[in-house]
C-alpha cells in the first residue's frame, strides 16, 4: 500500500465536506424532531385547546403522509440531480438551492404561516401541505446531492471512506448539539420578547433561524471548499433505484428481509424515544432546563461508539454487538420508566440508550447480503440493497412524527401545559406510548436478529468461496448473447510478478483453485486493467472483481487466497462498478504484507466466469517474470 500524502487542497476539501454535514444534520434534527414539538407547544398558542388539538392531529397526519410519499419520489429526485449539468457540477447547485429554499420555507412554517392558523385554519391547512411538500422536496434534493457527491470527490476508496467518516462524525455533533442549545435559546429569546419564562413562538422561530443560517453557511462551505471531478464513466455507472425494486430485493433475499426488519424495529424505538425525550424532561420530570444533558451524553457516547466498532468487531461477531447494543437499549427503557425521578439513573439510562451498534451492523450485513443474493438467486443488487436502510429511516421518522403528535395530545402535553398540569392518567398514557412500546420494539429486534439473521462474517466468507467456485465453473453467469462466431481478446498482465499455471494454484487450505485461467505470484500490490472493458461488479470484501471485455469475455481478477477473511482491510479501489476502463488503468492496491502476516497468500488469480465459451486459452509461460501491461495470452471464445 502506498503512503497517502494529503495536500493542502485535500485537507480543505475534507474539512469543507465535514462541516457541510454539521449544519445539514442539525437542520434535519429541527425538521424531524423539534418541528413537531413546536407544533404541539407553540404553533397554535392562543387558540381554543380543543381546536388546537384537532389542528395538531391534522397537521401531524399530513406530515406523515408527505413523508411516506417521499419514499416514492426520492428516486425521481435522484434522477433530477443526475440529469443536472452546470459549470459547477451536478451536486453543488442542488446542495445550495435545496438548503436555501428549504431553510426559507422552514422559517415560514415556524411562523405558523404568519399566524394564519388563528385567522383561517382551513386555508392554513391547505397552505401548510403545499409549503411542507415543497420544503420536503428541496431538503431531499440537498440531502441526495450531499451524500451523492462523495464519488465525485474522489475515485480512491480510501479517500471516499475518509469523506464519509468525517461527514458522519460532524453529523453526530450537529444532531446532538440541538438538545444542548434548544431550551436556553428558545426560553431566552421568548423571555426577551415577551417577558415570559416559557418555550414560546418567538423563541422557536429564533431557534429555527439560527439552525437555518448554520445550514446555509455550511452548504456554502461545501460548495466553495470542494471540487467535483467530472467523470463521464462515473455518470454512466450510476444505477437508478425504485421503491418496487427495493421491496423486490427485500422479499427475494431473506438476509435482506430479516436484518431490515430487525433494524426497522430498532429504528422505530430509537426515533420515537428521541422524539419524546423533550416531553419527558418538560412534563414528566419537570426539568426542561436539564434537557441539555441529553445532547452532551449522546455526543460523547456517539463519538466513542463509531471508532470503537472496528476494534470490537475484530474480537466480537457483529451479531453479538447488535444484541449487546439492543440489550443496553432495553435496560435504558427500564431506567427511564422506573428511575426518571433519579438524576443518576436517568443519566445512566441515556448512556445505555446511546450505546448501540444497530446502524453499523445493519449496513455491513446488508452489504454482505449482496453476495448472498448473487449466490442464492443469481442477481447482484448493490444500489437496491444500499437504498433499503435510508428508506427504513425515513419510514421510521414518519411513524415517529405520528406517534409523538398523538402522545402529546393524548397525554395533555400541548399548548401552554406544564408539569404541574399532568395527571396520573396522562403520565401513564405517555409511558405506554413513549416508553413501553419502544421497549417492546427493542426486545423484538433482538429476537428477530438472533433467530433469523444467519449471515455472519464467517458465513459470508463461505458464501464468497462458494460463489468464487461457481463463477469459475460457469454455474452463475450464463451466456445470454447469440453466437456470432469466434471472438478473440488479448489479456495483459494485471500485475508485476511471476506467471503461474492455473493447475499450480493451491489455496491457503491446500485445495486446488477451480476453473480456467492463469495466476501471478506478485512482486507488488498494484492491480491494473488486463484489457479494455467494463467493471461488472466487486465483492464487498474488495478482494475480487469481474471485468468484461468490449466483445464479451468475462474475467474475474481474484487478489490473494484466503484474503476474503480480511473483509476489505488492506484493499483500495480506484474505480466504480459499471465503469469503463482502459488496459493498464490502475484499479486496485492491496497490502501484501498484511495478507501474508495473517497466513494468507498474495497470489493473483485471473479466471473466466464462462469457461464453456473458451475455445482456446493459449499457452501460459509459467515461471516467466512479467510486468503489468505485458501480453500474457490470446483467448479465443464464442
From Swiss-Prot:
Subcellular location, in the record's words? Answer: Cell membrane
Q: What is its main location?
A: membrane
One GO-annotated biological process of the protein: sodium ion transport
List modified residues, type Phosphohistidine.
558
> EC number(s) on record?
2.7.1.-
Q: Which pairs of positions does the record mark as disulfide bonds?
A: none
GO MF annotation terms? kinase activity; symporter activity
Q: Which Pfam families match?
A: MFS_2, PTS_EIIA_1
Alphabetic keyword roster? Cell membrane, Kinase, Membrane, Phosphoprotein, Sugar transport, Symport, Transferase, Transmembrane, Transmembrane helix, Transport
Residue intervals passing through the bilayer: 27-47, 56-76, 94-114, 121-141, 166-186, 204-224, 261-281, 291-311, 320-340, 343-363, 395-415, 429-449
UniProt GO cellular component terms = plasma membrane
| Topology in the lipid bilayer | Multi-pass membrane protein
The PTS EIIA type-1 domain extends over: 503-610
Q: Where is this region: Permease?
A: 1-470
Q: What class of enzyme is it?
A: transferase
Induction behaviour: By lactose.
Concerning PANTHER family, the annotation shows: MAJOR FACILITATOR SUPERFAMILY (MFS) PROFILE DOMAIN-CONTAINING PROTEIN, MAJOR FACILITATOR SUPERFAMILY DOMAIN-CONTAINING PROTEIN
Family to which this protein belongs: In the N-terminal section; belongs to the sodium:galactoside symporter (TC 2.A.2) family.
What this chain does, per the record?
Responsible for transport of beta-galactosides into the cell, with the concomitant uptake of protons (symport system), and also for transport of homologous and heterologous exchange of beta-galactosides.
Any idea what this protein is called?
Answer: Lactose permease
Record gene name: lacS
Amino acid at each position: 500500500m502506498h503512503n497517502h500524502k494529503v495536500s493542502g487542497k485535500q485537507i480543505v476539501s475534507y474539512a469543507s465536506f465535514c462541516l457541510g454535514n454539521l449544519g445539514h444534520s442539525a437542520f434535519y434534527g429541527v425538521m424531524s424532531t423539534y418541528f413537531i414539538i413546536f407544533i404541539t407547544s407553540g404553533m397554535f398558542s392562543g387558540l381554543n385547546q380543543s381546536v388546537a388539538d384537532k389542528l395538531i392531529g391534522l397537521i401531524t397526519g399530513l406530515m406523515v403522509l408527505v413523508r411516506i410519499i417521499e419514499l416514492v419520489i426520492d428516486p425521481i429526485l435522484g434522477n433530477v440531480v443526475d440529469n443536472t449539468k452546470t459549470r459547477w457540477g451536478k451536486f453543488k447547485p442542488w446542495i445550495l438551492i435545496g438548503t436555501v429554499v428549504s431553510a426559507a420555507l422552514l422559517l415560514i412554517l415556524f411562523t405558523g404561516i404568519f399566524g394564519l392558523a388563528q385567522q383561517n385554519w382551513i386555508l392554513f391547512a391547505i397552505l401548510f401541505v403545499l409549503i411542507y411538500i415543497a420544503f420536503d422536496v428541496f431538503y431531499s434534493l440537498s440531502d441526495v446531492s450531499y451524500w451523492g457527491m462523495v464519488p465525485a470527490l474522489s475515485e480512491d476508496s480510501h479517500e471516499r471512506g475518509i469523506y464519509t467518516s468525517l461527514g458522519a462524525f460532524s453529523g453526530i455533533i450537529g444532531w446532538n448539539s440541538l438538545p444542548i442549545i434548544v431550551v436556553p435559546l428558545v426560553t431566552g429569546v421568548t423571555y426577551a420578547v415577551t417577558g415570559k419564562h416559557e418555550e414560546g413562538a418567538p423563541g422557536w422561530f429564533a431557534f429555527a433561524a439560527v439552525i437555518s443560517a448554520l445550514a446555509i453557511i455550511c452548504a456554502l462551505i461545501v460548495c466553495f471548499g470542494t471540487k467535483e471531478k467530472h467523470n463521464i464513466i462515473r455518470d454512466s455507472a450510476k444505477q437508478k433505484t425504485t421503491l418496487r425494486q427495493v421491496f423486490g430485493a427485500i422479499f427475494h433475499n431473506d438476509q435482506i428481509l430479516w436484518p431490515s426488519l430487525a433494524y426497522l424495529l430498532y429504528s422505530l424505538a430509537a426515533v420515537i424515544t428521541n422524539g419524546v425525550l423533550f416531553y419527558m424532561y418538560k412534563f414528566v420530570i419537570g426539568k426542561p432546563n436539564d434537557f441539555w444533558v441529553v445532547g452532551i451524553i449522546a455526543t460523547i457516547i456517539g463519538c466513542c461508539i463509531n471508532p470503537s466498532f472496528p476494534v470490537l468487531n475484530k474480537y466480537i461477531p457483529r451479531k453479538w454487538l447488535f444484541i449487546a447494543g439492543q440489550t443496553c437499549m432495553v435496560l435504558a427503557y427500564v431506567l427511564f420508566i422506573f428511575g426518571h425521578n433519579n438524576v443518576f439513573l436517568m443519566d445512566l439510562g441515556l448512556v445505555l440508550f446511546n450505546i448501540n451498534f444497530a446502524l453499523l451492523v445493519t449496513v455491513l450485513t446488508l452489504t454482505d447480503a449482496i453476495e448472498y443474493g448473487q449466490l442464492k438467486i443469481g442477481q447482484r443488487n448493490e444500489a437496491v440493497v444500499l437504498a433499503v436502510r435510508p428508506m427504513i429511516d425515513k419510514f421510521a421518522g414518519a411513524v415517529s412524527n405520528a406517534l409523538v403528535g398523538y402522545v402529546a395530545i393524548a397525554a395533555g402535553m400541548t399548548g401552554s401545559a406544564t408539569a404541574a398540569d399532568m395527571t396520573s392518567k396522562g403520565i401513564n398514557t405517555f409511558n405506554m406510548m413513549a416508553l413501553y412500546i419502544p421497549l417492546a420494539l427493542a426486545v423484538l429486534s433482538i429476537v428477530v436478529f438472533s433467530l433469523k439473521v444467519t449471515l455472519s462474517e464467517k458465513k459470508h466468507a463461505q458464501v464468497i468461496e462458494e460463489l468464487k467456485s461457481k463463477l469459475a465453473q460457469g454455474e452463475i453467469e450464463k451466456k445470454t448473447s447469440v453466437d456470432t462466431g469466434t471472438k478473440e481478446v488479448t489479456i495483459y498482465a494485471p500485475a508485476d510478478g511471476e506467471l503461474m499455471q492455473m493447475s499450480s494454484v493451491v489455496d491457503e487450505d491446500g485445495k486446488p483453485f477451480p476453473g480456467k485461467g492463469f495466476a501471478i505470484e506478485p512482486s507488488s500490490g498494484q492491480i491494473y486493467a488486463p484489457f479494455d472493458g467494463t467493471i461488472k461488479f466487486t465483492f464487498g470484501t474488495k478482494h475480487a472483481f469481474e471485468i468484461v471485455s468490449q466483445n464479451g469475455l468475462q474475467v474475474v481478477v481474484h487478489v490473494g487466497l484466503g484474503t476474503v477473511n480480511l473483509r476489505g482491510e488492506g484493499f483500495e479501489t480506484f474505480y466504480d462498478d459499471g465503469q469503463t476502463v482502459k488496459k493498464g488503468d490502475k484499479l486496485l492496491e492491496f497490502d501484501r504484507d498484511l495478507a501474508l502476516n495473517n497466513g494468507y497468500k498474495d497470489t493473483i488469480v485471473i479466471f473466466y466466469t464462462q469457461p464453456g465459451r473458451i475455445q482456446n486459452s493459449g499457452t501460459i509461460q509459467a515461471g516467466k517474470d512479467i510486468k503489468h501491461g505485458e501480453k500474457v495470452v490470446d483467448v479465443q471464445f464464442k
